[in-house]
């Protein structure tokens, strides 16, 4: 008789798991990006965090309903297969393996190195920081390959530690900023600048910037099989957990504004560490910076785990290039070594791209785009067919769950896609046109996306033909 997972988690544990999964290192460096996008407007910045949080709540609620229907499903690729079929599931898995996870992993390696480098006064684009980023990539790969238990302990420790700077900055920064006048000064004049197309353009850019900090919520639906009364508790856990995350991010953002001027927070070399040092002093700021580094390492470790398993998950379905090679499991480490090496190489390529496109003068010309944002928005676009097929297939669901909720989720995803096109297409196009140049990053990102997905199509069809032969 097949042994089933025990339903051992209650509602409170589920909420904690959602919060622990979603809250990550993105808030530490994206807070600066948000202010840069809004040109220092705190009101627009807060609006961006709230809007993206609302989109998170809508989509996570939709997935929670799907999770109660497909109780044996574990992971977004399985949801894709359940709703749209195995072919769509394969393409989503290919995208996540070769674009989504490695792009985020490459960025996180740099973010981790950047915050460690700040303590030594290194520039965020210095050779020292990039060398550290490379070492972090290789180090997390080695940790997962040779000591997965230790990697798991790092994950647990980082989950607790990453909450420390967020909570302290949210409380102490807000109090300090209110008493010394920094916080009111940062909000002064913000409401006056909210009218006009420029404000809307800035808001779209800020919304897309925040999406990195919220990513990871769909992983929380994987606890469905181990949750007591999942039909009741999972939707509540996702919504309440999401509200806690939104509140934490907004309060942290406000706390940072209480610890430093908007100009200081926009400083590309320091940003949030300015606020930490102003509020907690040099030593206190240094300690909190160490907490951020550990938090980033935990997130990087989690992303590396996903990156190294990607080709294995495809090969396990007898798909992709040479499934027998990527499906092999090392008897000593119980890891798919070939899949892990592929994941590491792709992560390194994306990190090099991120440096060349976003941190240097722009190595790739028209093909420069922000790899920390556009791949994440892409997955929202790829949710849309899943929601549509849910409405087509699930005839036994009530009207609200079959039509109303997925339609709202589709609108939320379309808004995110529109915001990305505006922020990474229309706005840079208008700015470049004013200088007599041309720029439309999102279009050239889609070219790269199409090429990588076409490679996936080649291997899918080739493998399918081999099976049929």
Q: Would you name each region that the model predicts?
A:
Residues 76-81, 85, 118-122, 239-301, ...:
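TM-loop-TM module centered on a large, flexible mid-protein loop between adjacent transmembrane helices
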Residues 369-392, 399-469:
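A generic transmembrane alpha-helix motif of multi-pass inner-membrane proteins
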Residues 4-7, 46, 123-128, 156-289, ...:
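Helix-loop-helix junctions that connect adjacent transmembrane segments
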Residues 33, 57-137, 141-145, 293-310, ...:
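Hydrophobic transmembrane alpha-helices that form the core helical bundles
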